[in-house]
From Swiss-Prot:
It comes from Bordetella bronchiseptica (strain ATCC BAA-588 / NCTC 13252 / RB50). Its main location: cytoplasm. HAMAP family: UreF. Keywords: Chaperone, Cytoplasm, Nickel insertion. This is Urease accessory protein UreF. The keyword Transmembrane helix does not apply.
Length: 220
């Protein structure tokens, strides 16, 4: 619960991951189009790459395989197709790593392994924190994905804008699809080799356009 809290001081509230640009372009303009956009990102960008990658990182940290964890961390960083997306995961990963260091999570050796990530990405540090706390993989993965969902809905409420009740309706709909998304992510991570798919051209183009958008509330 701590790791999925919106009060976690890692700056998630300042990012929309392309949603603000989709609003500017008219792709997202009301509750229905917002729900369609977030669902699309959930079942493609999140379920096919970021969530299974989180599972692989978690298993590597839990097994004490720092080399594998560092390798998957680099893979994720390389998969971020725009400068904003790279800067987002770097900043949030760095902030979470600093929090883990300040609060003394895990062992000194594990904290040193996290500090050695260059750069530290958010899924790598989040998965490590869950492994440090000996959380079940399913609980940690669920917290990670639901935190992403909440952030997307919060960004939509500010950016479209939408009312609080619309936000809660969307969360209710999106939450209902989470079990299937998490199951897909686990299956992809468990395949040999892992089935990771980062093909999302519209997402990348919208994110790139946001970098030069004239008026912005969010950093991505």
């Amino acid at each position: 619960m701590h790791l999925s809290s919106p009060a976690l001081p890692i700056g998630g509230f300042s990012y929309s991951q392309g949603l603000e640009a989709a609003i500017e372009l008219g792709l997202v303009h009301d509750e229905a189009s917002t729900l369609a956009w977030i669902e699309s990102q959930l079942v493609t960008v999140m379920a096919r790459a970021e969530a299974p990658l989180w599972c692989l990182l978690f298993e590597a940290w839990r097994a004490g395989d720092d080399a594998a964890a560092h390798g998957w961390n680099q893979w994720f960083h390389a998969s971020r197709e725009t400068r904003e997306l790279r800067q987002e995961t770097e900043q949030m990963g760095r902030s979470l790593a600093r929090l883990a260091q300040e609060l003394g999570w895990g062992t000194a050796a594990t904290r040193a392994a996290v500090a050695a990530l260059r750069p530290a990405t958010l899924p790598a540090v989040h998965a490590c924190a869950c492994a440090m706390w000996a959380l079940p993989r399913e609980a940690g993965l669920g917290a990670y994905v639901f935190s992403w969902l909440e952030n997307q809905v919060a960004a939509a409420i500010k950016g479209v804008p939408l009312g609080q009740m619309a936000g809660q309706r969307m969360l209710e709909r999106l939450r209902a699809g989470l079990p299937a998304v998490l199951a897909d992510a686990r299956a992809r991570a468990g395949a040999t080799p892992p089935r990771l798919d980062t093909f999302a051209p519209q997402y990348a183009m919208v994110s790139a356009r946001h970098e030069t958008q004239f008026s912005r509330l969010f950093r991505s």
